[in-house]
């Protein structure tokens, strides 16, 4: 049974520049934003800059391999996706201006707009082409780079799973890996890998070239993906980092050092990475080359490292040194009762990118399905009585009516908690019609 129940909410203290950040939707991760509203306080921002603290150092800026929110910042703000969602959850054009689906061949075709890559100085390097998506996907599928999100590709793109697995086995053979269960890997002169597991017949894997993977640059502005099956959520997947483009020559030049600094990162999004110094600062500047630059209203986003951001942030807000900080419950009352700070405090925007919910265990007994098995519950948990209870509608309703959402949310959101209530699994902005 899952026990998560409430959504994380925070109280933010913000200076004037935060309003622009909210309107522009800049601080994004996983297609979402997190920013406080602004009113009344002195701020370091001039209306064109936005400064915040960070206290957790990202392990990488490589958007093609990471899977954590903090490390997605560069990919979310500095690299555009083929399609994107607007603030109402409606899918819009991104780097692709149109797309078509061929059900007979399970192929999506995307037509790209004119766009450019820029370096850390904002200078144009080269145009964005369909080949950049192909090269980026090959990078994700290269085991040496250990992409944490490779499963978002291998599960859906034709040939990707075979390509990735073969190269994992090949690496194992070349490095003499022996699995914990005794499985060994060998490779012959023709590149055929043999995997030998205990008590099993050896399995052989012929070489798989990347040409077998279902991604193709038809020309500079036409890109196709061929799927393993008709997956209705594929367009949504394109908003995730492993489907973002990367400049091929830069990937080839930098290898595992790609996106480890501003100099090894090229951008084609709303911002470009202008500077990055580990444990010091992180600066993104507006990209004037971006097709949607007219709708980006902040020129510079600066992140300053401060190991005690949660402690120092509120005081730095008062001094006008930064534009946003988290206000803890230990000082919230004093801020709200002080005429000089009360108007600086506002609730964070509700995050409707995900939900938490209870899921009951309806299978307390062991059972063998065609493709998986359930071990069942230990006798001490009385599986027979469990089954009787869990299949009783009134028993399940007791959980529904026994949870007081308001009381739970009020712990972290003492003011305005009603805005964060959610009584459905599907977030309200999950989908929308033309209206």
Put a short name on every predicted segment.
Residues 2-9, 31, 87, 113-145, ...:
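Extracytoplasmic/periplasmic ligand-capture domains
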Residues 47-56, 107-110, 269, 282, ...:
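Short, well-ordered beta-strand elements
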Residues 146-212, 365-391, 435:
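Surface-exposed intrinsically disordered loops and tails
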Residues 417-435:
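Structural transition elements
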Residues 1-9, 13-28:
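N-terminal secretory signal peptides
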Residues 180-212, 220-221, 226-302, 310:
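Gly/Pro-rich hinge or "lid" segments in bacterial periplasmic/extracellular proteins
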Residues 30-41:
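Bacterial lipoprotein signal-peptidase II cleavage site
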Residues 53-103, 266:
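N-terminal lobe/hinge region of extracytoplasmic solute-binding protein
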């Amino acid at each position: 049974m899952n026990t998560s129940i409430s959504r994380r909410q925070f109280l933010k203290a913000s200076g004037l520049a935060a309003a622009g950040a909210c309107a522009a939707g800049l601080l994004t991760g996983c297609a979402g934003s997190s920013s406080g509203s602004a009113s009344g306080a002195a701020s370091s921002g001039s209306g064109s800059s936005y400064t915040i603290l960070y206290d957790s150092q990202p392990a990488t800026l490589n958007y093609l391999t990471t899977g954590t929110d903090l490390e997605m910042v560069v990919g979310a703000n500095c690299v555009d996706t083929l399609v994107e969602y607007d603030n109402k959850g409606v899918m819009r054009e991104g780097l692709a201006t149109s797309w078509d689906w061929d059900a007979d061949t399970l192929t999506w075709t995307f037509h790209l707009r004119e766009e450019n890559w820029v370096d850390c100085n904002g200078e144009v390097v080269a145009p964005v082409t369909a080949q950049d998506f192909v090269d980026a996907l090959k990078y994700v599928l290269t085991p040496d780079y250990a992409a944490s999100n490779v499963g978002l590709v291998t599960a859906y793109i034709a040939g990707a799973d075979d390509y990735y697995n073969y190269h994992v086995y090949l690496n194992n053979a070349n490095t003499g890996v022996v699995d914990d269960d005794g499985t060994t890997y060998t490779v012959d002169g023709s590149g055929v890998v043999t995997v030998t597991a205990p008590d099993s017949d050896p399995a052989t894997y012929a070489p798989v070239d990347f040409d077998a993977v279902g991604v193709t640059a038809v020309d500079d502005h036409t890109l196709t993906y061929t799927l393993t099956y008709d997956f209705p959520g594929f367009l949504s997947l394109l908003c995730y980092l492993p489907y973002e483009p990367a400049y091929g020559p830069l990937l080839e030049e930098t290898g595992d050092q790609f996106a480890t600094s501003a100099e090894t990162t090229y951008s084609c999004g709303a911002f470009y990475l202008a500077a990055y110094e580990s444990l010091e600062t992180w600066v993104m500047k507006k990209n004037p080359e971006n097709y949607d630059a007219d709708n980006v209203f902040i020129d510079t986003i600066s992140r300053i490292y401060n190991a005690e951001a949660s402690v120092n942030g509120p005081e730095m807000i008062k001094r006008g040194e930064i534009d946003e900080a988290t206000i803890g419950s230990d000082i919230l009352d004093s801020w709200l009762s002080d005429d000089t700070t009360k108007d600086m405090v506002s609730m964070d925007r509700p995050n409707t990118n995900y939900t938490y919910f209870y899921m009951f265990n309806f299978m307390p007994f062991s059972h063998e399905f065609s493709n998986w098995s359930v071990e069942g519950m230990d006798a001490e948990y009385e599986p027979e009585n469990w089954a009787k209870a869990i299949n009783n509608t009134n028993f399940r309703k007791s959980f529904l009516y026994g949870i007081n959402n308001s009381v739970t949310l009020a712990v972290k959101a003492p003011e305005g908690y009603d805005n964060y209530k959610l009584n459905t699994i599907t977030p309200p902005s999950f989908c929308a019609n033309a209206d």
